[in-house]
Amino acid sequence: MVKSKRNVVVNMTKVTKNPGEKKKKLVSTIKDIVDQYKFIYLFTFENMRNNKLKSVRTEWSTSKFLFGKNKVLSVGLGKSEEDELKPNLHKLTEHLEGECGLFFTNEPKDKVFEYFTNYSEKDFPRSGFVSEETITIKEGPIVGMTHSMETYLRGLGLPTTLKNGVIFVDREYTLCEAGVAVTPEQSQLLKLFNHEISEFKFHIKGFWNEDEFTLCEEESQEE
């Protein structure tokens, strides 16, 4: 006897993201807030962490951070004297390179420079991070780690054995090497052994204020 089958309706439509709308929103945001702030800072950053950036945003709740593609940020501020939102903003956009962002604020310049120059937050390195130091783990027992972790550690490349319920490192092992990018496996090992060698920090490239753009001394020397 043939069993009847229910017709199944398959929706073949696919929801596509509209990157154009996101760009328009960012450009619109820049145009909306540029009159609200006296200073616009251009900064670069290293080893960005969203959770730590969230804390920074909270500390500067009356100011505004903006991130996006440099080309879009340039469009928002203006690429030339003809289309810039404020006099000399095009000079700021000329330096939008690499990983950077914009910081809009009315806070005093000295306060901003003091904060961002001294800001530094340690974290565990991600894959691709280039270490400034070589870290090794010595041969012998691992203290404070349960025996059930041995297989996992070995899978990450650490030469280990289990002896009487204790994990032993069979020989000295390099967790990371100075000047060499960290692998995904090394990233996990460094975290397991509590090595926070990555540092999230900012570098101010320049700032716009009162219709003038000032390039920071360090940046001008590099150029």
From Swiss-Prot:
Keywords on record: Cytoplasm, Nucleus, Ribosome biogenesis
Pfam families registered for this protein in UniProt: Ribosomal_L10, RL10P_insert
Source organism, top-level taxon: Eukaryota
Subcellular location: Nucleus, Nucleolus; Cytoplasm
GO biological process, one term: ribosomal large subunit assembly
Principal location: nucleus
Listed InterPro entries: Mrt4 (IPR033867), Ribosomal_uL10 (IPR001790), Ribosomal_uL10-like_insert (IPR040637), Ribosomal_uL10-like_insert_sf (IPR043164), Ribosomal_uL10-like_sf (IPR043141), Ribosome_Assembly_uL10 (IPR051742)
Cellular component aspect of the GO annotation: cytoplasm; nucleolus; preribosome, large subunit precursor
UniProt entry tagged with the keyword Transferase: no
Family (UniProt): Belongs to the universal ribosomal protein uL10 family.
Assembly and binders: Associates with the pre-60S ribosomal particle.
Known role: Component of the ribosome assembly machinery. Nuclear paralog of the ribosomal protein P0, it binds pre-60S subunits at an early stage of assembly in the nucleolus, and is replaced by P0 in cytoplasmic pre-60S subunits and mature 80S ribosomes.
Protein known as: Ribosome assembly factor mrt4
Organism: Dictyostelium discoideum
Gene name for this UniProt entry: mrt4
